[in-house]
Amino acid sequence: MAPPVLRPDNAIKRADELISVGESQAALQSLYEYLTARKIRFAQPSTVEPIVFKFLELGVDLKRGRLIKDALHQYKKLVQGSQDGLSSVGAVARKFIDCVETKMAFEHLKAEESQTEEDDDLEGGVTPENLLKSVYIQDQSVAGFNDEVVTSWLKFTWESYRAVLDLVRNNSQLEITYAGVVNRTMQFCLKYNRKNEFKRLAEMLRQHLDAANYQQSKIGSNIVDLSDSETLQRYLDQRFLQLNVSVKLELWHEAFRSIEDVYHLMKMSKHTPKSSTLANYYENLAKVFLISNAQLLHTATWEKFYRLYQSNPNATEEDFKKYSSIILLSALSTPLDILPTVGYDPQMRLYRLLGLESRPTRNEMIELAKQEDIYKHIDEDIIKLYEIMEINYNADTIKTEIAALLPKLEAKPYFKQYINQLRNVLLRKNYVSLSETENAIPTDALYDKASLPGVLSLPHWDMEKTLLQAAVEDYVSISIDHDSNTVTFFKDPFEIISKAAGTVEEEEEEEEEEGEEVEGEEAETGEEIVEEGEEHENEENKEPEPVITRTTFIRNRLAELSNVLEEIDAFKNASYLEKVKLARETLITQTKDSIENLKQIAEDRAKRAQEQKKKYMASAAVRAEEDAEIRQRQILEEKAALEAKLEQDAHRRLVEKKKREFEDLKQREIQKFIDEFNKKDHAAKIASEEVQGLDIKEIKTLIFSKLSQDKSELEDRMTSSLQKLDHAERAYRKSELPLLRKEAESLKETDMNKFNDMKSKIVDTARAEFDAKMEDHNRLVGVYNDYVSLKDRLTTTVEEKFKLIRAENAAKFEAAKKARIEEVRKQRYEELVAERKAEIEAEEREERAKKQEETARKQKEMEEAAERKSKASSAAAAKSILTGGNDARSAKLDEIARRQREIEQAAERKAQGPSASTEAPDDEGRNLTYAEKMKLRRASKK
């Protein structure tokens, strides 16, 4: 079967005609029907693309996103089987995005221009006349352009990006188009600050990547190959751009997820990204860590960035100075980590992002910044700050030193982001230093000594919070007396624990005494149960089992730790912070030893269990054979017993079935009899439960007795009920009569009071409204003359303006009318000339057709005559050969043949016909007339 005929030009022409008459929706629908027709499968995609482009342009103008999405998917489904089908899909997708972005830019520019025009006239437009006009003009908007128009186009643009991404996703032949659309979508979100759309875009890209990973194990055409370096690099570039846009939009959670995506893709990739790309990645990573308060990782990231930036050929000394200073400043801003810690670190995943095996320390970061290639570029002011904080730290002079250095630091743009972290570090160092020199100090004096100058200062309330945080993290041990506003520093970490232990022991003793009192009361109330009392006395004579709580366990461990540390000389003379550090290190060492012991015990237990398991398996193999024989014998016996039991059960079930059938038949007959009785119109009814176990005869007797009993009972109840009803009704009416009269009097009085109140309220309200209206009337009478004069002046001004405008518009209308008349007249003249030309051409074509028909008819007649002549001449020649004719006869025949050839040549020339562009032939070469042809024919016959 031949493929259907496609005429794309006709579809575009039809759409243009509909658009020209204002039927854009119909034009769009006609193009949609053409694109989604099945005959598109047989066409070359290049011939259909102009129709798709026209459809996209028209659909974007009309904002028919759903229709466009459906048409694109249908188009992809129809053409993807052809050779260049997917390439055409990519071109169509790019064209769609171009149309949408162009339209979006145009709408946004138009809205901005409208906003600028209205902003220019905001001050000059507020006049008394405009205020009066605003009373009767409904549209009083002064907010600039209509934001809803731009918002609707933003939504349409976003949905268009989503539709295209869904169209080209996870296809190896559309990877470049997919990457380009992803980049343009991210730029759209960044340009118009679309945070929610960017989050959904990032989630969509992750789903696409997950689907691509899932397809790696499948077999199919056009599957994305993630093992290809170019494909993986494209995905990696998308994630780098995603991270960059996340940071610019300040979507920190989304930025962190993008960092994880980049990390996993870099692990999959065999090639290292470019240094500039990695430098940008680490710069964004540092911003994310700064926002998440991961100061150590922030410093480590800046160090990696600096190493990559050193290979930049365009780097300047100022850049090295800036970035090296940031590394040292961020290291100084890292919180103190003097005390060792154990346990799970929630930031372990973040360490792996930077290739770190464990958590780095603050000192390591500072030493990292002190490396020669970094330290030589650091700003002198930052070096002075480092010397003040780490080398020459003195709590008494640090305030003045910082105050002298702070103005220079504030002049540096990168210092502002580390102010809070530096403040916390300095305050904690001050608190630790004061805890070593002071025992008890007033709170105001403490805060004055620990406070910092300038932007590093804090109010007392926030300083107290930092002090409590330092105590929580065990850098100081304090006791705050709010009555005397005094802070007491403890020098020994076990001192406050021992005090707390004494308090806890007293509370436990009180609880035990209360428990004994309660037990005594229960014993007094339980004298009636002698046996239980004796058992209770026997239990009391026994020693109570010790109850170990979590608090007791911790207290005992701390007491043991205290005894161990008291034997160390360095512990006695150390400061509080050094004691805490030594205690933690000792406790960690002991815990590690105990954990190692437990691991060793568990390994020994596992070895013994493994050996026992091997022994058991060896003996189990022998027992398995014996058990198999026993089981086989038991199975045969059970099978025989089961068959015998099945036969007995089958016989029993057959007997029971017969009995059930007989009982069912009997019950159906009884139920039928009962139903017929219950259908009759009488009061007595019989339930199925009443006739359980009775036969038909007994049921009939029961029915007769029920009917007799029901009849007598009904008569008695009717008589009694009538008497009761008569007496009760009379009694009710007598008793309620005085109550009804009393209620009527009270209701009458209540209604009269309500009426009087309502009447007075109506009169008062009417009087108040009248007075208010009279006041308004008196006020308006005073300004009425001014209002009339202003109205007349405005009316006169507006009428004069409108007269000028009307005159101008009338002149313009007349000029346009004359121009239109001339244009229509000229157009009609041209149409008439064109019609006349067409008629003349039609007549000429008709005349030429008639001449050609006549020529063909004459040519046919000449061919027939020539054929007859040739047959006759051939016969005559044969006869002359047989008879041996003379020379004169042969010469005559030659002349006839020559003339015949001339006739045939003339017929051929006539059949070819004269060309329209050729000139008229001369008389010498003209065709023979009909009379000349007849003479030649007669001569040939002779």
Curated annotation (Swiss-Prot):
Residues 499-529, 588-669, 705-734, 821-912 form a coiled coil. Residues 502-546, 836-942 are annotated as: Disordered. Residues 320-494 form the PCI domain. Its main location: cytoplasm. Residues 504-538 have a biased composition (Acidic residues). Residues 836-870, 889-911 have a biased composition (Basic and acidic residues). One of its GO terms (molecular function) is mRNA binding. Transmembrane segments: none annotated. Keywords: Coiled coil, Cytoplasm, Initiation factor, Protein biosynthesis, RNA-binding. One of its GO terms (biological process) is translation reinitiation. It is found in: Cytoplasm. InterPro entries: EIF3A, eIF3a_PCI_TPR-like, PCI_dom. One of its GO terms (cellular component) is eukaryotic 48S preinitiation complex. Belongs to the eIF-3 subunit A family. Component of the eukaryotic translation initiation factor 3 (eIF-3) complex. RNA-binding component of the eukaryotic translation initiation factor 3 (eIF-3) complex, which is involved in protein synthesis of a specialized repertoire of mRNAs and, together with other initiation factors, stimulates binding of mRNA and methionyl-tRNAi to the 40S ribosome. The eIF-3 complex specifically targets and initiates translation of a subset of mRNAs involved in cell proliferation. This is Eukaryotic translation initiation factor 3 subunit A.
